[in-house]
Amino acid sequence: MAGVGIRSYACHRQTRRLLDGDVLMSPGPGNTDMPQTKSSPIAHPYPGRLITLDGIDGVGKSSQIEILAERLRSEGRNVLCVRDPGSTDLGTKLRAMLLDSDLEMHRRTEAMLFMASRCEMIESTLRSALADGVTVISDRFLLANVVYQSVGGEVDAQTLWQLGRLACGGVQPDVTLLLDLPAEISMQRVGGEADRMESRGVDYMAKVRQAFLDELPNAGGRTHVIDASGTIEEVAETIAAIELF
C-alpha cells in the first residue's frame, strides 16, 4: 500500500508532551516498531469500547466508519455508530445550528453548544451502550471540539479540555483514529458543499489540521494518525491492521 499508512504524533516533535507519557509498541504489517500513544491507562469503567474517528473535513470519516462497523459486526461484535454533534434529538438541532453558514456565533458559544450535545449523547446513549458491552464508533468527539474552538485563540485548548472532561462525565475514547490530510486536498474534496466552519478557507483548515496533530496526545486512550490521502480501500486496510481491542 504505497503512500498510505499510520504514523505517530511523535513525528511532530513540536507538539505538547503526553499526559502520563507512555508510548506503546503496536506491531503490524510493515510497522513492527510503530509507536502507539496512550495518554491515560483507563478510558472509562465499562466493558464496551469507544472508538472515535476524527480529522479535518474531507478526510473520509463517514466512509471509514461504515466500513469499520461492517467489519466488526461480521466478527460478531455489537456495534453502535454515532456522530458528535448529533445522534439525539437535542444534538440534531444543535448540529443544524452549529453548521449553519448564515449563523454567526462566538467560539465560546460554539464550544458550549458542542459540549451540551456531547453530554446529552453520553448520558442518553453512550454510557448505557458501553455498560452493555457495545462497541461504539463515534464520528468526532471531544478532540474536535477542542481543536475547532481553540483555533483562532478566542478559547484556549486547556480550558476546553477541562470543560470537556466535565461534560463527558468520565467517558473518553479507548482508541482515537485521526485521519490526516493536507488542507488543500481537504478543500478540494469538500468542493462547493462547505458548511459554516469549512467556509473559513484553506488557511483556517491548515491551522485546524495542525491543531489536531498537536492536541491528539490529550485525547485519551490509544491514538493513531492515519494517512487519508489514499483510496477508500487503502485507508480501510490501514485501519484494519490496527489492534482496536
UniProtKB/Swiss-Prot annotation:
It catalyses: dTMP + ATP = dTDP + ADP. ATP binds at residues 55-62. The keyword Nucleus does not apply. CDD domains: TMPK (cd01672). Keywords: ATP-binding, Kinase, Nucleotide biosynthesis, Nucleotide-binding, Transferase. It comes from the Bacteria. Its EC number is 2.7.4.9. InterPro entries: P-loop_NTPase (IPR027417), Thymidylate_kin-like_dom (IPR039430), Thymidylate_kinase (IPR018094). HAMAP family: Thymidylate_kinase. Phosphorylation of dTMP to form dTDP in both de novo and salvage pathways of dTTP synthesis. This is Thymidylate kinase. It comes from Rhodopirellula baltica (strain DSM 10527 / NCIMB 13988 / SH1). The gene is tmk.
